[in-house]
Amino acid sequence: MATYNGSRYVAQQLTSILDQLDEDDEVVVVDDASSDDTRDIVAACGDHRVQLHRLPVNRGYAAAFEAALERASGEHVVLSDQDDLWPQERLVAMQRALGTASVVVGNVAVLGTDAPLRGPFGQREWRLPEDPSHRVRILAGLALSNVPYFGSAMAFRSDFLPVLLPYPASARELPDAWIAINGLVRGTIAHLEQDVVLHRLHGANATGTIRSPRAVLRGRLLFVQMLREALRRRGSGRGSS
């Protein structure tokens, strides 16, 4: 988990995570130089499984998450935002899927309604394709920002970390897509039908924000760069997945 000025909701999120963990599991939290009391709240939870790391200066969301991945030591790496909630049985379902896949992604529901997210092109229900084997089609949808691959709904095996790290420059704006692209090009990604995140909508994270044409164009350029790098890493035999 990467945190930044998340004092309002981070304690609730930590509780929803810790309730599903075993005693020898860990929660790696990297705080990106918050200016509020987020770090104090995390430290005050008093659970030995929570490992808090403080960045001395604000480096941005992707860099903080990369720092958290570098510190992860468990067999399975399960990602989390600071202000959502984990529904019950999330961890069990994702660990089961990781028995045969390197990366697993689930769906996202809106907290308080259990309704699915609305899509960027007017879809009333924005959900993952049931079959992730249609990789070219899914990659094309991802290039158009029309596949709901959220990092907070992802998990992967620890042997996938060498595939992802270090992040290329192109992934520092779209780290969620970077994970998905690598899972797709290697054919090792699984989709869960169930909701694995209860997403909290508030002013600081409003889903569905309209992007400018320039931002859309830049996103597609970054996608191409990430895809090329993922293919290069696969060709070089990087990682064991």
Where are these regions (language model features)?
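Nucleotide-sugar donor-binding/catalytic module of glycosyltransferases
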Residues: 1-211
